Swiss-Prot record:
GO CC terms, sorted: cell surface; centrosome; cytoplasm; cytosol; membrane; microtubule cytoskeleton; plasma membrane; spindle
Residue span of region Hyaluronic acid-binding: 635-645, 657-666
Purpose: Receptor for hyaluronic acid (HA). Involved in cell motility. When hyaluronan binds to HMMR, the phosphorylation of a number of proteins, including PTK2/FAK1 occurs. May also be involved in cellular transformation and metastasis formation, and in regulating extracellular-regulated kinase (ERK) activity. May act as a regulator of adipogenisis.
Lineage: Eukaryota, Metazoa, Chordata, Craniata, Vertebrata
N-terminal signal peptide: none
The protein's name: Hyaluronan mediated motility receptor
Gene from which the chain derives: HMMR
Molecular function terms from GO: cargo receptor activity; hyaluronic acid binding
Amino acid sequence: MSFPKAPLKRFNDPSGCAPSPGAYDVKTLEVLKGPVSFQKSQRFKQQKESKQNLNVDKDTTLPASARKVKSSESKESQKNDKDLKILEKEIRVLLQERGAQDRRIQDLETELEKMEARLNAALREKTSLSANNATLEKQLIELTRTNELLKSKFSENGNQKNLRILSLELMKLRNKRETKMRGMMAKQEGMEMKLQVTQRSLEESQGKIAQLEGKLVSIEKEKIDEKSETEKLLEYIEEISCASDQVEKYKLDIAQLEENLKEKNDEILSLKQSLEENIVILSKQVEDLNVKCQLLEKEKEDHVNRNREHNENLNAEMQNLKQKFILEQQEREKLQQKELQIDSLLQQEKELSSSLHQKLCSFQEEMVKEKNLFEEELKQTLDELDKLQQKEEQAERLVKQLEEEAKSRAEELKLLEEKLKGKEAELEKSSAAHTQATLLLQEKYDSMVQSLEDVTAQFESYKALTASEIEDLKLENSSLQEKAAKAGKNAEDVQHQILATESSNQEYVRMLLDLQTKSALKETEIKEITVSFLQKITDLQNQLKQQEEDFRKQLEDEEGRKAEKENTTAELTEEINKWRLLYEELYNKTKPFQLQLDAFEVEKQALLNEHGAAQEQLNKIRDSYAKLLGHQNLKQKIKHVVKLKDENSQLKSEVSKLRCQLAKKKQSETKLQEELNKVLGIKHFDPSKAFHHESKENFALKTPLKEGNTNCYRAPMECQESWK
């Protein structure tokens, strides 16, 4: 079998949108195309025509009131959309407030970190001060030990040297004595002729001895003066001990500062706990707001569904309202009474809004006044700080360590000023947030007023529509009364329609009650929101007051600390001036002693030279005396030798006395030199301590040399040259 060829366009329908099913005839279409083509039956034709007629009748029979009701329902849906937008705006505002609170929390955390850094710096300063105190105490202990050792060693070395010198002199004298005894036996005769010469020389030596005795008296007077000066030095040492007592007082102050630091740490921990609690509370509030948003969305969906149902019911019941205008007149009177009630409620709400607006204005004025007061206080504090800084700059030029502390305090004050500026910015932010909240409340109130005005307008339009419909219905009623005899059969249907209208009226009453309840709920919500915002405002005011009190306390504490530091600087400057004056007095007093020591050394050398010349003369006299006495009798020789021995013993005793006096003088001079070195802070190297000392001697000075102390190194150099 062979099939016919299909055309190119298979199953090709006409272009364009097809009509609705059942609204067209198959026969009126174009020629059928495709392999399968058959003619449909005409079973759907009558139903289609009937449905079209019904739809046309429905469209024509709908009155203008029903169309207006539909427009009112669209307006209600628009109102619901507006309410949702307003709620979304509120949610955004709350989220912005949450962001601002998070920023505040971050700022507080940064402030806590700064406080911790300051505490760490204070602890470091404390440790450095304690280390410096420990090193100073060690140095004092070492100096006392070195002084005791030097005293003991100088006394031992002096005795040993004197013993050695005396032993050597005794040996020499013994040798000389033996030589003299040998020469005396041979030279007694020559000595008798030279006795007169020796007597003259003895008289001259006696005169010299008298001069030496006068010098000894002057030396004793100088010793008395030196004792008085040593007493003064002991008084200075007592003052140094008083300074050590002050160091102990400073240690006690440091302990008190440690306790204060512990208290500050506890306060910081409490602040952290309060911050954590605030964060938890805010998170809970955010969760509650999210839950409220979900509930509002659900309510929106319910309202939309209800509106749809109401639209359907209203479309079904509007045809029955035409014949039953009598009941609607009664309902109209009731609605007029309700309108009066609504007007009274609106007036009350307007009065409340005006009172709230006045309260907000008064609150804003109070905030502005407080802000001005804060600015004036800040200006005063800044002026005082400038004055204090000028005073500090004048007072702290002498001591560098105190300058560094003042700089650190100035930096802390700058940080506090920055904090105050930040707090002012926070105040401005809080005021801005408050104004935003008030604006939002005003917007909500305006939206509510607009919604109420729209409701009243809708109600008035509905009244006008009902009046026009009532007039139409009156005309229709007159025509119906004329046709009442003819329409007797339709009386039962009319009664059913009356019952339906009554049910519809009841539903309208329910709708009005629902609207009233919703308006009451919204009013309560507005009141709750206002109360919550007022509570937040009061909380912010309390927080600001607390922060102001804290800042005032901090400023007072810092002013007290500054005053204490100024007092300490004044005391230190006074002590420095005292020590400078004492040092200058000591230096002026020690200058003549140094000159006297130089003069004593010159006299000592002259005496030693004279002693050598006298010994040479004695030797010559002895030789000549021995030559003279060589030929005389033994008795005379013996007598002369006895006299010479007596004179020799006297001379030896005088020489020993003079040596003892010289040794005492040397000891006193060494003691004075040691005390001078202690006062001037100069150390001399002791050879007995070589390679045995614990700490190095030539260490670098920690503090630089001050003005006026350039002569402190001349005295020891001159002393060293004089001892050389």
